[in-house]
Amino acid sequence: LMDMLEAGQIDLMPNISYSEERAQKLLFSSNPEGTERYYIYARPDRDDLAKGDPQALQGLTIGYNPGVMQTFVGQQWLTNEGIACTYREYDGDSVLFDALANNEVDAVIMNDTISSPSASPMFYIGSSDYYFAVPKSRPDLMNDINAAMTAIARVNPRYNDEVKSHYSTQNSGSSSLNGPERS
């Protein structure tokens, strides 16, 4: 889809993370559409990870989606924490959570807009803003988007948060009890 957007075959895409490389090919809205938070998720019964010690991730297999901001941020966080782990690539969010549920991986790197009953966020690893993006050939459309976003923000400064809360799958985690709660 990104190739189609860059080529002008798609006029508008929401939820695009900004990068210098992308800014050479696309126009981004002046203000963010929202903020995405990134986590390392694991099965709810992983009491060893629920204690909050990143070193518990040492040697584990961690699933990720290729070419997305959360993977870059997550792998950088793991490196900064001194974690040596094995990475396994999966195409698609549902495939990634299925791999976690089926014990193919010990944990996954994912954003906060996707949820699964077989996954609980264990470690907050970072965040980034996301934007509306249009092809460079459509500055007229970007001007309209920026004007609309400004008008909305003037009326309701929390509009973006409300939309995200209403339409994204908020991770309610699992209804499973962890070790201390079971005691």
PLM feature spans:
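Extracytoplasmic small-molecule ligand-binding "clamshell" domains
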Residues: 1-20, 24, 64, 80-82, ...
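Acidic, polar ligand-binding/catalytic clefts
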Residues: 1-56, 110-127, 136
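Extended ligand-binding regions for polar small-molecule ligands
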Residues: 44-70, 126-174
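Sec-exported extracytoplasmic/periplasmic mature domains
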Residues: 6, 10, 62, 75, ...
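N-terminal globular core domains of eukaryotic regulatory proteins
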Residues: 2, 87-89, 98-104, 124-126, ...
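Alpha-helical transmembrane signal-anchor helices
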Residues: 174-183
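Ligand-binding cleft/hinge of the Venus flytrap
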Residues: 29-31, 56-58, 67-89
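Extracytoplasmic/secreted envelope proteins and their assembly/folding machinery
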Residues: 2, 6, 10, 37, ...
